[in-house]
Swiss-Prot record:
Protein name (database record): Beta-ketoacyl-[acyl-carrier-protein] synthase III
Organism encoding this protein: Lactobacillus helveticus (strain DPC 4571)
Family: Belongs to the thiolase-like superfamily. FabH family.
Region of interest (ACP-binding), residue spans: 255-259
Lineage: Bacteria, Bacillati, Bacillota, Bacilli, Lactobacillales
Membrane-spanning ranges: none
Amino acid sequence: MKFEDFKIMATASSAPDHVVTNDELATMMDTSDEWITQRTGIKRRRIATEETTSSMCTDVATQLIAQSDLTAKDIDLIAVATMSPDYLTPSVSAMVQGNIGADHAIAFDIDAACSGFVYGLHLVKQMLIANQQKNAILIGGETLSKLLDWSDRSTAVLFGDGAGGVLIRNTAVDKGSFISEDLRTLGNLGQYLTAGQTGNPSPFATDQQPFSPFFKMSGRRVYSFAVKNVPESINDALKQANLTADEVDCFVLHQANRRIVERIADELAVSMAKFPINIDEYGNTAAASEPILLDQLVKQKIIKRGDVIALSGFGGGLTVGTMIMKY
């Protein structure tokens, strides 16, 4: 089985109906539409009311199968990248598998925060090779609103909820290919972006860690990390592919902050016209951001078959992942 045999056959996305604007947040905390927009590029975000990570991911999986000539029983593998699962167990992927009736599928979750979807592309490829399987669904899904301190303007204004995904097939049909990848982890910087610290309530625990479920972030440290490591990762992946940045038709980057994306474009010496943005409408949706954006670009025919695209995620861990592919 060749690396080039892996194709994205379909894309899909799902998001809560409820929209929260910057002006609404300004009634809850010391902020304003102008303050948020200037610093992040975000105007509004989707926030779950009754939706869950598993329900949105199930919607994505259902859409993907409906776009194909497959049934749920033809799916061999389901992977979900998330840092905001419904439960620690069962996994979101197992819930999706049960919800859609994909009885033969292996299912597992991936926790690499905002890089999770790109890490997932690598892992799905390797799993299909190892198990000699054919059809996989990869989804990035998040309900980050449950990890937010809604009185903290430094984090509450940044994040949103949603899910996006792809149907991957290892087939020789001429519908694009994975070309190269670059994955990296800087665990020594992990303390600059944390969420979901649960502590240990056991009466036998001798070191009682604090219960701190909400996002905490050093914005300046994360910014510095991103604008250095993401261009390096993209350039390394392009070098493996024997391509230049100018030969990429579209850069599908994690939607963390408009300023970060603009700086990455500058570092690569590529026009912002090749860096589509949807953070203004969705905020930062972590592992869901790249597949949601990819689905929008495919549906709008901005990305077409044969286009060379660079997918890059970056964030908690701290982690970076880049995949170069021909769509």
